[in-house]
Amino acid sequence: MISRHLQNNLMSVDPVSSQAMELSDVTLIEGVGNEVMVVAGVVVLTLALVLAWLSTYVADSSNSQLLGTIVSAGDTSVLHLGHVDQLVNQGTPEPTEHPHPSGGSDDKAEETSDSGGDTTGEPGARGDMEPSLEHLLDIQGLPKRQAGLESSRPEASLGLDDSTCLSPSPSLINVRLKFLNDTEELAVARPEDTVGTLKSKYFPGQESQMKLIYQGRLLQDPARTLSSLNITNNCVIHCHRSPPGAAVSGPSTSLTPTTEQSSLGVNVGSLMVPVFVVLLGVVWYFRINYRQFFTAPATVSLVGVTVFFSFLVFGMYGR
């Protein structure tokens, strides 16, 4: 009996163990073990980390090299500029100090020998530093040279040049003609010039098409002078060029299109209210005679539209 019971227990346990064995045999990729997949993943991750580190290392080295070159260039420029200052200081005469009368001949001999050594040493150093100085001047470019030339000029000549350049002619004024596309043109005129003269001078053949506007005012009278219109130096006059077909002969013809357009606008606006009243009347007629086609929400909406339109009409015409 005991042996049969054990056999039955073994038979009942066998399906569970077989299912466990089947689950343990399942792999991510058929034909490749899970251990191989884990090792491959670790290798790929390691390679990715190494490549990322190498890329960042290369970028850092290039940046450091670039910074090093910039710093070295800055140091050389500072050294060259310091040498230039030394040369300038050497070029300026210094006040000579008279030797003390109590000094002996030995001191004078030592001073002369030291000064001779310095003078012999200076040409060599100056000759060594001349190429670097020329290289510095080539790097700095033309503005540095121009600045040096301008600084070497006497102050009197600079004052004369400035006075001659900045002194404008009292009989001429500069007028800025600004167009609609934000382009400007500089016009030179006299305060006694008229608007017609300005148009014919800068817009020949287009006098009738050009409209000049100054401080929001249209300059229509061609006989008015610039001084009478308070147009001074560096004033801005807005210019508008109308198309050739839109050239107007006089003020009477310019007023007729505006009046016609305003009358048309009034007619269209006055027709909108009667048309809407007729539409509302037709809808209410169908609502009264064919009420089976109108639901409760449609009737409520119609009542609301009618009330709103009534308030609107009373507000417009009840003023």
From Swiss-Prot:
Recite the UniProt keywords alphabetically.
Answer: Membrane, Transmembrane, Transmembrane helix
One cellular component (GO) term of this entry = membrane
Q: In the UniProt record, does the keyword Transmembrane occur?
A: yes
Keyword DNA damage (UniProt): no
Q: Where in the cell is it found?
A: Membrane
Q: Which Gene3D superfamilies does the record associate with it?
A: Phosphatidylinositol 3-kinase Catalytic Subunit, Chain A, domain 1
Give the coiled coil ranges. Answer: none
Instruction: Report membrane topology.
Output: Multi-pass membrane protein
Extract one GO BP annotation from the record: ERAD pathway
Transmembrane region positions? 36-56, 264-284, 293-313
Q: Where is this region: Disordered?
A: 88-130, 146-165
Q: Where is the composition biased (Basic and acidic residues)?
A: 95-111
Q: List residues of the Ubiquitin-like domain.
A: 173-246
Organism superkingdom: Eukaryota
Q: What is this protein called?
A: Transmembrane and ubiquitin-like domain-containing protein 2
Name the species this protein comes from: Rattus norvegicus (Rat)
Name of the gene this protein is made from: Tmub2
